[in-house]
Amino acid sequence: MKIFLDTANIDEIKDAIEYGLIDGVTTNPTLISREQKEGRGFSDIVKDILKTVDGPVSIEVVATDYQGMIDQATKIHNLGPNAVIKIPMTLAGLRAMKTLSEKHIPVNCTLVFNAIQATLAARNGAEYVSPFVGRLDDIGEDGMEIINQIRTIYNNYSFKTKILVASVRNPVHVLRSMIIGADVITMPYDVIKKLAMHPKTDEGLSKFLSDWKKVSPDGSFPI
């Protein structure tokens, strides 16, 4: 199981790398728009991320037609060997996935909301499929159930496409993804940090440090 960071913020990426917490990065047009500054455009942001991350980086096309997707995907692919092309789950997107996979250009099929869509993406050669569990929760569905369904279907038919759980909102999403057997989980940095936290851990550490002052009143480590 791998963990990806869902961000275009280079500082968050560098922090997460320093802690040894991530294996890759996912971005989208919204995340990139938040990092855009005067004199620093899309290409600059993406190139920085690709150079910083020693792992796959998903970058999304914004074209909605087949040829536009292929043209943009080719440009993104040429930015770095670790670039993965995010293609939306549409009919045009499925056609683009097939073409790109035949050229051995890795694709992350995004905006997936049911297991049939995920199956079509796998049939057309997607390297990753990204079901959006949090957004399904938002409309009253159990977003994690789609992960269970996809895992079963992929196992049934020996699809090699990796399940990349997206729209992750909390550690419960992460835990359930691990139990089901998702291949990758991508999440914002605040969720990643929460994975290492537990109130009983904080409580226990505070108690140990308090007791240590009985051994070393100034808190030093006398060795």
From Swiss-Prot:
The keyword Transferase applies. Transmembrane segments: none annotated. It is found in: Cytoplasm. GO terms for biological process: carbohydrate metabolic process; pentose-phosphate shunt. It catalyses: D-sedoheptulose 7-phosphate + D-glyceraldehyde 3-phosphate = D-erythrose 4-phosphate + beta-D-fructose 6-phosphate. It is an enzyme of class 2 (transferase). The active site is at K86. Belongs to the transaldolase family. Type 3B subfamily. This is Probable transaldolase.
